[in-house]
Amino acid sequence: MARGGSRRRNTSVISTQKIEPSNESTKAPEGPQKRKPKTEIPNSNGNGVIKKEIKKRKLDNELDESQEHLAQLITDFNLSVNELFQLKEYKTIAYWNPDDFSRASSTSQVPEIFDLFSKEPEYQISWGADSNEQDLSNIPLRLQKKIINEREQKLLEKFPFKEKVLKRSRDLEIELLQNIRQSKKTLEKSHIKPSPPVKPSKTSKGNQKIIKKKQVVKQEEEEAQENHQNEEYESDMDEGTHYKLKAVKYSIPPPIVTHPSHIPSWVPDPNHTESSFNSKDSEIIDYHPDAIQFVSNSKTTYTTPNIQAKIQNFLASYKSAIIDETSSGDFNNTLEEYEKIMTQQEQFIKKLYEKTSIEKRLELNGEKIERRKTVLPHSSNTKQAVDPFRSHGAIIPKTQGVTIHSTHHDYFLSHGMAFSRLHQQMRRQHQLRTKKITQMIEQHFKKKKGEKERLAKEKEQNLKRISKMAVQAVKKRWIQASKVYRFLQLQKEEELKKIKGREHLSQMLEHSTQLLEAQFNKSSRDISEVDTENENETDDHLSSSSDEDSGSPQNARDDSNVNMDENDMQLTVEELRAKYADIDQSIEPSSKTISSDSSNHESDSDDEDIDANKGLVALYGNNAVSVEPVSSLAATEYTDEQKTLIEKFSKEDEGISSESVSDDSLNDSSSSESDDDSEVDESNHKQVDSTKPTGLAALLGNGPTEDEEDSNDDVSADSDGNVSDDENMSTTDEEDEPKTPKSSEDPKMDEKENESDVLEEEVNGSKVRDVPLPPLLRGTLRPYQKQGLNWLASLYNNGTNGILADEMGLGKTIQTISLLAYLAAEHHIWGPHLIVVPTSVMLNWEMEFKKFAPGFKVLTYYGSPQQRAQKRKGWNKPNAFHVCITSYQLVVHDHQSFKRRRWRYMILDEAHNIKNFRSARWRALLNFNTENRLLLTGTPLQNNLMELWSLLYFLMPSSKVNQAMPDGFANLEDFQTWFGRPVDKILEKTSNGTSSDVIDENDKTTQRMDEETRNTVSRLHQVLRPYLLRRLKKDVEKQMPGKYEHIIYCRLSKRQRYLYDDFMSRAQTKETLASGNFLSIINCLMQLRKVCNHPDLFEVRPIVTSLAMPRCVANSFASTDSVVRKYLNDDSFKGQVSLKALNLDITSLDQLNYFTSQTTSKLKSSSELDKQADKLNELISASEYDQPNLDNFLEYYKFIKSNEQVGIRDNLKHASYLNSLRCDRIPLLGESVIKFLQTATQPRQPFTDAYNDIILSIPKRVEKMDDVIEKYSVLTPSVVTLDLKDQLIPLSTQRTIMNEVANKNIDNPFHKSQVKLSIAFPDKSLLQFDCGKLQKLATLLQDLTANGHRALIFTQMTKVLDILEQFLNIHGYRYMRLDGATKIEDRQLLTEKFNRDSKIPVFILSTRSGGLGINLTGADTVIFYDSDWNPAMDKQCQDRCHRIGQSRDVHIYRFVSEYTIESNILRKANQKRQLDNVVIQEGEFTTDYFGKFSVKDLVNDAEVADIPDKPLEPAYGNVENVLAQAEDEDDRVAANAAMKEVAIDDEDFDEESKAATNTATPSQTPGPDTAGSGIVDSTVKINNKTDSLEDVDYEDGVSHVDEYMLRFIANGYYWD
């Protein structure tokens, strides 16, 4: 008890920071002086020690008062935390010792659990406002230490006294702990004399236990209170001023209730049935305890002598026996009983000692005492035989404990039994030894018998083992030699392959040069034909006859050409160059017919020409012999046999090429249907098909010749004029070009053609003939569009396919329609033509045809399968239609029907969508039966050069030798090696890394290249120039306004920065970015882009509501309040007391007139009545008959008269009172005043309008205060109660209001305010201020609209459009919206309305909303709220505004959030945009390159620096699907609806080819030749096992054995 009390006493000291111990002492009568409380903690040794401690503390203390106070607060805080931990951990502080968990104490070790508890933020002292704001748990340890050190430095700079204060607080804590320990020692040493025990009053035996327990509890409470008061406080008594004060005594009244019987309402329970409860327990004890007296003096503070004496008496007289509590009940032992029990236990322990130690009959077995057992030794382990006849050898059982007295007979029997056991044991041992010896002898002789056989067998096994090891070593050596040989062979083949590739590239460049030279020569030849027309006519007849005569020699020359081509295949590149070095000189002009009798020199020259043509065709024909005959230069016209032979070989070629490129999945058409179609095709094209040589044969030899019916079109067919302006492609104009005579039956047409042939112009670096504008075309063409028509016409005349890659908005559609009109008007080729377009622009193409070329029969192929089948009926008939327009999806779905139809021109719009050459759809379109192909695209490159290769191969595959396409386009690996990898290096070298806000598109990237890089780009331009036409708006339309792009960097708002950093600091985000999973990374990047666009896309602002509690706090006092109100509202006394008689009811006087009351007051006569009453009083007072004598009649009569006088006096007094009461009545207000007020308030007269305007009704007042309520009702309470109205409004009033509301008589005027205060929606202005981009957009739109500009706002996310709508509505801008949900028929109406109405300043659109032909030239500003993943989509959006018809400069603003993922994406996109200038722009082409991004480049965050720099490589074609999966569910649905049209178009091209496609149709998949593919396969196999190729001998040097093995393998004698 003393220990617990001491600890509780210490607790009270620590928990109260400042002690005020002397308040109660002022109440004691002994101490009249008041003690002033002080904050010092005293020592119990006296005031002298206290002074020394204070002086010592003042000397050691160098801190000022505030710092000293701060140290004291830190000490108290640490001890309070210690105390709180004790309470939370142990639920009590009764046994708490502050020294246990103190950090200042050197003797105690702080437990880990307390260390964790004290590190919680609420239990730590913060020196700065921002010292603990940031959570460092997710930061690496190195950064944590750095941040902590920085904080410490800042705190030391801010609080230089921090270390001193902390040290002082530790010293104070140590001093306090020392004082506590000293106080404990003092209490242990103190001795208090016990006082005599207090006799309790008479109690029953049954109540004795209860009273004792109550006394113990009371003593504990008194002791706790005493210890609390006797705490060692530092004395506040100064001997100099309080020397007369010796001691202070005061008493505390005892508790009133010490027994249940002391409670007034307590009654014993009559149903109590316990045995321990008897009748005496119900006896009420009259107990009067003494008051507790406290004594305080200078030496001892707060002592209670009487309680201390009781405690000492109790401890001295307390005895308790040591008994088993489980088997005994609750004993209340007296001293006699205690002594008796102790004596019994002592005797019992003595007996146990005798039995266990002396007699040794008992033993302690664990916790039990048991009888000791007799132990016999185990004789089974006896090793030596014992002599049974010796007494000392006998085994006698040994017993522990008391010796057992056995007889001789007992010993004899035990000895015999022991001897018998020994005998049996010896016998068993002898038998075992005999068996062991026998087995050893047996094994010895067996081993001796088979020793020779065993040795021979072991020798044979050793030989086999050695042989096997030798064989394995030799085999391993041969395997290594085979691997080395294959490796060496692969190296040689790779070197040869590289050499052949370089030679092939040179040949391609020569072919392009020759092709352009031939086109130029042909143009010059056409000019010379105008001057020599009459001569050509005669020459035509001569040449025709000569050709007929020389038919056989021509065939012979063809055969010789085949043989010479076979010889050319055996020659090297240098030999071929030497052989065909004079190819240009061999082409000499000749206007005369060459007969079979010509000179040898001329025939040799002709042979060289034929060989040159043949060699080049073979050179670019995949080493295949061309079966197309090439006419000699001397022949001006083919003979009939030659035409028949050329037509036959041409058909065979077409069949072979279609078979080589066909797909297994596309060969399920019926034979009968194909036959019918072929017959119809032949009938359709009998009059329009021409058998003309194409490719180099057409350029270097004669121009294409038509049939007799189409001979008048020969002049226009010869209109090819592609002449290169490169320095390396110089031409010789002085040379005489060969003339190409032609036969024509219509001289008028020839004259017309000759007039048009004179005009020529330069297009794409080549001179092409200016063709006449077709009369079928309605409208006028711009100059550059007319040039495009000339270029397209030259492609057709030369039999070459091409790509029209003009920038979006330059009119590729009208140029295509002009080409078809030109073919119909000039060449009488009406079709049929197939135009494949995206689904979204099918209607646009049909409208363009009806607008510009209504003479064509256009079949728009769409609808359900039944509708499409109906449209196919009869379409094989001649002139059923001229042009068929369909979509990619339908043309692939019905590819069988389209394959059976023969098409003159197949035109693919938006051809960049067929960039995936591995898909089955690409191969299906490749196998269509078409004579010419034209691709239309605004972006020939989107991602890489391989897509450009895919388009070029689609135009003219390598299997079609009659096409002039080089074989290099069929070899993907070589093309990628030549151009793909160098261009990637160009990007790295030429990226200037500038961060300018304005991008200059006129900057020539090649100016910053070195010579080698410039040559590579020049070669690429040289190869592509004959087949691709690319014009930009800024080049062809000089009067077109400029385009300027600005980068606007937007700072993140506070909320955006918090969400962005919070997402980046998550451990899950770091793991996802480091994992490399493309889908997960894209999901993370999409979330970051949402934060940058608007934080509501990432996390919506919450709607704040109050916590509704069913009851308020005052509800618990409702019952008490109702009782009090009931008594206060009790009106029962009003019936017993008349307030009116007492003149207290002042309200009843309101009807009295004031003037009447004045008149009535004059009637007051109470003074007269009072005089009479006074006289009667005198008479009555003189009377002496208070108690008359009844025997005396006279006295009794006088007494009666006296009583009558008293009655009269009382009546007079009462009359005087009533007179005064009634005459003194004066009204509070008066009747006149009340009537006047009633008159003023009663609506007796109608109110005026002015009065109604001034005095507002409640509804009008609510309406007027609507703005005030809207602005200032913003504070939503945290908690509300539902029953508060019941506490404030009476039930009767509530019922009345409810009835009125039900009858619709009244409305709630506070409804809006209640709603505003109960639920708080986010303010609409936060939509702008939560986002940095919207803040910039608000400023930008304000400036744009003020200057009369109109803007297009593009975004990728559909939800951003919703946010922009809210933003524009808030600012009051008129706008229009276009997304994927807009119908096709409404799209054109919206665009026309926007272009027409200049009052609409803003048009918001989705970048993927479809409608590639949308014209929005009414706007001159484009704002990209967020950039698309693919820059090509953004470029198309720019072209919707910056196109033909725009009259103002176009400014493009791109919003980028700085220091985020968007800035990193923009930096990488600008890097890749340099390819736009390198490959296409400067080579008159273009590209939008979306290179490979790595996670490290995109994130660029210091916290995620451990992310590997690995590029993101998703599955080919699945990027859109991955991006769609990264969207939210709602946003995904909206985006799918918005991009529905684009999805329909894209799904035609995004399908990946299956793995079996390459193996099933090897000829259809472009790639290297057979040998090359074998090399690649073997290379892969070797590379997979390169690590296993570890031969030390081979690395040291090849020995003679290794050389022999390699030669042996090279000769083909080794097989694996």
From Swiss-Prot:
Its EC number is 3.6.4.12. This is Helicase SWR1. GO terms for molecular function: ATP binding; ATP hydrolysis activity; DNA binding; helicase activity; histone binding; structural molecule activity. It catalyses: ATP + H2O = ADP + phosphate + H(+). ATP binds at D806, E807, M808, G809, L810, G811, K812, T813. The gene is SWR1. GO terms for cellular component: cytosol; Swr1 complex. It is found in: Nucleus. Transmembrane segments: none annotated. Disulfide bonds: none annotated. The keyword Transcription applies. Catalytic component of the SWR1 complex which mediates the ATP-dependent exchange of histone H2A for the H2A variant HZT1 leading to transcriptional regulation of selected genes by chromatin remodeling. It comes from Debaryomyces hansenii (strain ATCC 36239 / CBS 767 / BCRC 21394 / JCM 1990 / NBRC 0083 / IGC 2968). It holds the Pfam family Helicase_C. Residues 11-26, 1555-1567 have a biased composition (Polar residues).
